[in-house]
Regions:
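Residue-level recognition of well-ordered beta-strand positions that form the cores
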Residues: 67-69, 82, 122-124
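Extended, low-complexity, turn-rich repeat/linker tracts enriched in Gly/Pro/Ser/Thr and Asp/Glu
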Residues: 70-78, 127
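Short, surface-exposed beta-strand/strand-loop-strand elements in extracellular ectodomains
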Residues: 75-87
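Disordered, acidic Ser/Thr/Pro-rich linker "stalks" and the adjacent N-terminal cap
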Residues: 1-56, 147-163
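A short beta-strand element within beta-rich, extracytoplasmic domains
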Residues: 61-73
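Exposed low-complexity, polar/acidic, P/S/T/G-rich flexible segments that act as propeptides
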Residues: 63, 125-162
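Beta-sandwich interaction modules
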Residues: 50-62, 93-135
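Flexible, glycine/threonine- and acidic-rich loop/arm segments that mediate assembly and lattice contacts
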Residues: 72, 88-90, 94-96
C-alpha cells in the first residue's frame, strides 16, 4: 500500500492524499512551506518534517520517494533528501540530485527499506539567487496488515517570518 502526501508550497498549503486506502481526507499543514527562498552564495535551506500516523505515532513507515516540482532554481542547485530516526543523529539515508535546467521535475528515491521518523530536504543553490518550488510530494509505503490504517499527517518545523 502506498500513500502520496502532496505538500503544496504556498502560504495556504494543505496536504492531500492519493492512496489505495480510502477515507483519507486532506489535513492542514501546521507550518506552510515558503514559496520563495532568498539566498546568499552557498546558503542551504532546509524543509524538515516528521512522519507519523495520527492514530498511532509509534508506527514508523518507510519513505520511498520525494517528487519536487521546481518552478525556478539556478542550474546546478543541489537537492538532498535525508531520512532520520532522530534528528540529533546522522541521517540513516541520504540521496542528492543536481538540477540541469532552471525548471524541472525532480524525483528523489529513497531505499524502500529506509525507516525514519523525520525527513529533511536540503536545497543548496550554487550562487546568489532564489529558489521557487511549486510542489513537494512525499511517497510512503507500508505493510497493509501492520500498524494502523488511519490518516497520515506531516508536521513541519515552523518558519520565522523574517527567515522567509
Amino acid at each position: 500500500m502506498k500513500t502520496l502526501l502532496d505538500v503544496y508550497s504556498d502560504y495556504g498549503s494543505i496536504i492531500s492524499f492519493s492512496s489505495e486506502a480510502g477515507n483519507m481526507l486532506a489535513k492542514n499543514v501546521i507550518s506552510q512551506v515558503p514559496l520563495i527562498w532568498k539566498t546568499n552564495v552557498s546558503t542551504s535551506h532546509n524543509i524538515v518534517g516528521s512522519l507519523a500516523f495520527i492514530d498511532d505515532s509509534t508506527y514508523v513507515c518507510p519513505v520511498d520517494s520525494f517528487y519536487i516540482q521546481v518552478e525556478y532554481a539556478p542550474i546546478g542547485t543541489l537537492f538532498t533528501l535525508e531520512i532520520y530516526s532522530d534528528l540529533l543523529d546522522p541521517p540513516s539515508y541520504s540521496y542528492s540530485v543536481t538540477t540541469t535546467a532552471e525548471t524541472e521535475v525532480l524525483t528523489l528515491m529513497a531505499d524502500y527499506q529506509t525507516i525514519g521518523y523525520f525527513w529533511k530536504l536540503v536545497i543548496t543553490p550554487p550562487s546568489s539567487s532564489y529558489v521557487k518550488i511549486g510542489r513537494v510530494m512525499v511517497g510512503q509505503a507500508w505493510q497493509p496488515n501492520i500498524g494502523p490504517s488511519g490518516d497520515v499527517t506531516v508536521s513541519k518545523n515552523p518558519f520565522i517570518k523574517s527567515e522567509r
